[in-house]
Amino acid sequence: MAKVLYVKANPKNNEESRTFRISEHFINEYKKAHPEDEIIELDLYKENIHFLSKEEINTIMSKDKSNLKDHPVLKYTYQFAEADKYVIATPMWNLSIPAILKAYFDYITVTGITFKYTENGAVGLLKNKKAVVIMSTGGEYLTPPFDQWNFASTYVTTMFKFFGVEDVSLIAAQRLDIIGEDVEKRVSDAMKEAEQLAKQF
């Protein structure tokens, strides 16, 4: 049985969020294909996620964290490390990700748990895992010339690889705010892509 951590980074509900329409469809199809797996839903806007304080930074940078699994910050780090698969559902906001998702990555980027330093630099500790990033964008930022403005999926994908997760897929519904676009078709196309990926994820 695999443990899937489903991280949601949007204050909107499932019906209002175009991202969540896609990610919820992915999760539902995944459950059909993998009924034995455990899905852990983590809605960041329903958690006490905040910017790290000086005291919290000192704690997570301490050498011995083995007895801190219930710490308000480190509990998220250990939860992340213990998962086998990851689903990140996020919109692109202002060319990047919502601040709460960045704060979450600060929570889970902890040496000795998700990565470590060696004489050759940082090495990820989360090997043999996989992730999918589900994203919606108002414009088109995955292809030239505006791909260089994409600090959303590139950041999330890079963080996964920093943790050692090399198998990272991306499902993106783009151009959702472009005048004249058939938004429903673009969302529907992304849902179809999600449905196919869910079966083999």
UniProtKB/Swiss-Prot annotation:
Q: Where does FMN bind?
A: M92, W93, N94, L95, S136, T137, G138, G139
A GO term for molecular function: oxidoreductase activity, acting on NAD(P)H, quinone or similar compound as acceptor
EC code(s) of this entry = 1.6.5.-, 1.7.1.17
Q: How is the cofactor bound?
A: Binds 1 FMN per subunit.
Q: Which UniProt keywords apply?
A: Flavoprotein, FMN, NAD, Oxidoreductase
Q: Which cofactor does it need?
A: FMN
User: Could you confirm whether the keyword Magnesium appears in this record?
Assistant: no
Q: Which reaction does it catalyse?
A: 2 a quinone + NADH + H(+) = 2 a 1,4-benzosemiquinone + NAD(+); N,N-dimethyl-1,4-phenylenediamine + anthranilate + 2 NAD(+) = 2-(4-dimethylaminophenyl)diazenylbenzoate + 2 NADH + 2 H(+)
Gene3D superfamilies (UniProt xref): 3.40.50.360
Record-linked InterPro entries: Flavodoxin_fold, Flavoprotein-like_sf, FMN-dep_NADH:Q_OxRdtase_AzoR1, NADH:quinone_OxRdtase_FMN_depd
The keyword Aminoacyl-tRNA synthetase appears for this protein: no
Q: What class of enzyme is it?
A: oxidoreductase
Role: Quinone reductase that provides resistance to thiol-specific stress caused by electrophilic quinones.
Q: Which family does it belong to?
A: Belongs to the azoreductase type 1 family.
**Quaternary state and partners of this protein?**
Homodimer.
User: Could you identify this protein by its name?
Assistant: FMN-dependent NADH:quinone oxidoreductase
User: Which species is this record about?
Assistant: Coprothermobacter proteolyticus (strain ATCC 35245 / DSM 5265 / OCM 4 / BT)
